[in-house]
Design a protein with these regions (language model features):
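N-terminal polyanion-binding entry modules of DNA glycosylases/AP lyases
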Residues: 1-101, 105, 217-223
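C-terminal accessory module of base-excision DNA glycosylases/AP lyases that mediates lesion recognition
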Residues: 1-30, 124, 128-223
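Non-catalytic, well-ordered alpha-helical scaffold segments
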Residues: 42-46, 67, 102-109, 137, ...
Length: 223
């Protein structure tokens, strides 16, 4: 597998964004393991839910309504939500202050159950915080397998938003990998995951940068 040097990608991205200083200012926060351990369970559930509602919808509208989501679902407190009877879930799903989509609202309870179960086995925040980013695609698959509507990029976007170091298979990143003949099958296949993980690991070794920043820089290099 022949890869473009990451320095070349970085320089192209810097040119696209008007210089290194502007490029650096665009890079997201990557939290330390300890900082991720300190993230409360209700914040993980809130961000999972936000990303589920943003999927296939206008992100701006979800963000505008988010304070209402927080209020309607009690700040996404896990145990409170798991004790809520079905008829109250149905009532909350029809609240006009949120986006009324029953299939997405239903994921809140299901993903709360995933977090609760992980806490019985050592802790959800600990699981995610200590997961080796060198095998980050396996964490995406864990979320898809154990949660609800967390396939595609939804789980990965959640991790990025909270601060876990992860690359994203965005349209631009996928286009880069295809243009350079690094992948040729479906982007969500195990083979593509393995190749992408290897590519990003090599760039990380070259640059010493977090996967999140490498992923963003590849995106910015595409124009």
């Amino acid at each position: 597998m022949i890869l473009e040097k990451f320095d070349d990608i970085y320089q192209r991205a810097a040119e696209q964004k008007g210089g290194e200083a502007r490029l650096q200012a665009l890079l997201c926060e990557v939290k330390s393991t300890q900082q991720l351990l300190d993230v409360p369970d209700h914040r993980w559930l809130a961000e999972l839910t936000r990303k589920i509602f943003q999927s296939g919808f206008v992100w701006r509208i979800v963000n505008q309504k988010w304070d209402s989501f927080e209020q309607v679902f009690w700040g996404f407190e896990i145990e409170k939500l798991l004790m809520m009877p079905d008829e109250l879930w149905e009532k909350k799903a029809q609240d006009p202050s949120i986006i009324r989509n029953w299939s997405k609202v239903a994921t809140i309870k299901q993903n709360a159950q995933m977090i609760y179960q992980a806490n019985l086995e050592g802790g959800f925040s600990r699981l995610l915080a200590e997961w080796d980013s060198g095998n980050i695609t396996a964490l995406w698959q864990y979320l898809k397998r154990n949660g609800k509507r967390l396939g595609g990029n939804t789980g990965a976007y959640t991790l990025r938003a909270v601060g876990k170091d992860t690359f994203l298979l965005t349209h631009d990143v996928e286009a880069y990998l295809r243009n350079h003949k690094l992948i040729d099958g479906g982007i969500q296949t195990q083979r593509s995951f393995t190749i992408a993980q290897q590519v990003f690991a090599e760039w990380q070794q070259q640059s010493g940068r977090p996967l999140s920043h490498i992923s963003q820089i590849v995106t910015f290099s595409m124009g």
